[in-house]
Every structure is written in structure tokens, then in C-alpha cells.
Amino acid sequence: MKKFLLGLCILGLTNLISAQNDLAMATANDNDITIKTSKIKNELYVMSNSNETKQLAVRIKKLQKIAAAYDISKESIYSNNKSVTYDVVFEANGNYIKAVYDHNGEIIKSEEYYEDVRIPYDLTSQLAKDYPGWSFNKSNCKIFYSKEEASKFTYTIVLKKGNKSKLITR
């Protein structure tokens, strides 16, 4: 009887062994992949604040990339003979970048304003420690870029606690 039960168990397990899925792996030949890259003329503008840009909101990065990729030489107002500057405003959903381009199409300086953006984690945690029990209500971000200086970030945050509100600028 023991041999009979042992035989049934082994026979039952053999069906389970063959029911496993086969694994397949597809690999691509690295030599066949081509990567198209183009150098952005205003790469310094996008990368100038590399420590801060890691924590910037996605929509800030997107609008900055649009401003960096903009080619002033394709516009009808562009003059090849004069060394002048061009003021260009980029707007999207209440956010804007006022950029000043030089004759070569490089951004000399810019003023940026963004409403209701995600606040960087470092600043959020510091404010939570400084103002316990307060909630974040609104936030705005201003960025001032200059080719000669480091970018300056200013966050204006409205904190609320019941009927009270505080305006914090950092």
C-alpha cells in the first residue's frame, strides 16, 4: 500500500514538472543601435544649476528646454548685420520665461516665474520642522539666470493653519 501511494505521488509530480513555462530572452545587437544626439546651443542655461535642477518640477524643466532649444535666427526680426539682443517670452499655463538672447542665439539672462510648483524636498522638510502643524497652501518659484552668475532661486510659499496664513520666502 505504501508503494502504491508513493507511486501515485511521483506520478502526480511528473505532470507538474512539465507544466512550467519556458523562459525566452531577446537581446539586441549593440552595433545596430544608432543614437541621434544634437547639441543644444544653450546647454549652459539648462545645466547651469545642476544641483537645483535635480529637484526642479518637470514642467519647469520642460519650459526651460523649450527656451534653450529656441533658434532666434529663424525669426523674421533676426538681423545678421547687427549685434543686438532679443527679448523672447515663453508662456505655458500661467508660467513664463522672459529670456534675452544675444546675436549668436545664446541666452544672456532670463527671468522665470512658475505657479503652484512642487517644492524641493530639502525646503519642504525644513519648513515642516520650522512650522509644525502648518499645511502648504500655495507655492511660487522665481528663477533668475545670468550667463555670468549662478542662478538664483526664490520660493514663495503660503502656509495655512486654521484661519491663519503665513507667507514664507526662501
Cite the ranges covered by each PLM segment.
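Exposed beta-strand-loop-beta-strand "reactive/processing" segments of non-cytosolic proteins
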Residues: 58-99, 144, 148-167
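Short, solvent-exposed loop/turn and secondary-structure capping segments
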Residues: 102, 169-170
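Short coil turn/linker residues within repeat-based beta-strand modules
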Residues: 40-44, 103-106, 163-164
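Sec-dependent signal peptide cleavage junction
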Residues: 16-78
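Long, charged/polar, surface-exposed segments that mediate recognition or autoinhibition
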Residues: 99-137
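Gly/Ser-centered flexible loop/linker motifs
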Residues: 134-138, 143-147
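Bacterial Sec-dependent N-terminal signal peptides
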Residues: 1-25
